[in-house]
């Protein structure tokens, strides 16, 4: 097998089910997240209207850092995709036909502190906190009203959820940070 999680048993051991169709696991170290955030603070190429219906203050990972995008894509193909195929029983996604648009969103008071409720256009979506709630920012979190769940993953933790129909969500306001 060409991926790092060689059995479905391994995938299930590292994954926590948060709610219907929502799974979380630790993905990046705090040190990696801290270095990336430090680097992003000096970045000035943030967009405000790249998504027509639900614009976010973001940057495509591929435009921000092509080398990091390549590494991240390898991680998606070798860790996340096999995990999706395990926790979403019946999924048979292959890396050859699995595309992703990875972007980093910045929520900040005075720039964009929230995002209204919406469905993503993706089959699956990933939420990954690079900062720690209560330390680096206050407020926020991704709210799923149909599931009555507020997701605030710890720094470095990833949350996967279906994108299109079943997981309507929005980001609650960041109050500081």
Annotated model-derived regions:
Residues 2-96:
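Non-heme Fe(II)/2-oxoglutarate
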């Amino acid at each position: 097998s060409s991926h790092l999680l060689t059995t479905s048993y391994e995938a299930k051991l590292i994954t926590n089910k948060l709610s219907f169709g929502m799974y979380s696991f630790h993905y990046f170290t705090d040190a990696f997240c801290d270095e990336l955030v430090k680097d992003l603070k000096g970045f000035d190429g943030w967009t405000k209207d790249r998504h027509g219906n639900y614009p976010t203050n973001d940057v495509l990972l591929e435009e921000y850092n092509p080398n990091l995008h390549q590494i991240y894509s390898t991680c998606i193909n070798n860790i996340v995709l096999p995990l999706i195929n395990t926790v979403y029983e019946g999924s048979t996604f292959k890396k050859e036909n699995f595309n992703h648009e990875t972007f980093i969103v910045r929520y900040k008071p005075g720039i964009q502190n929230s995002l209204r409720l919406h469905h993503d256009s993706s089959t699956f979506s990933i939420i990954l906190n690079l900062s720690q709630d209560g330390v680096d920012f206050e407020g926020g979190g991704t709210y799923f009203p149909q599931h009555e769940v507020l997701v605030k993953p710890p720094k470095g933790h990833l949350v996967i959820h279906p994108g299109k129909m079943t997981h309507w969500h929005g980001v609650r306001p960041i109050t500081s940070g």
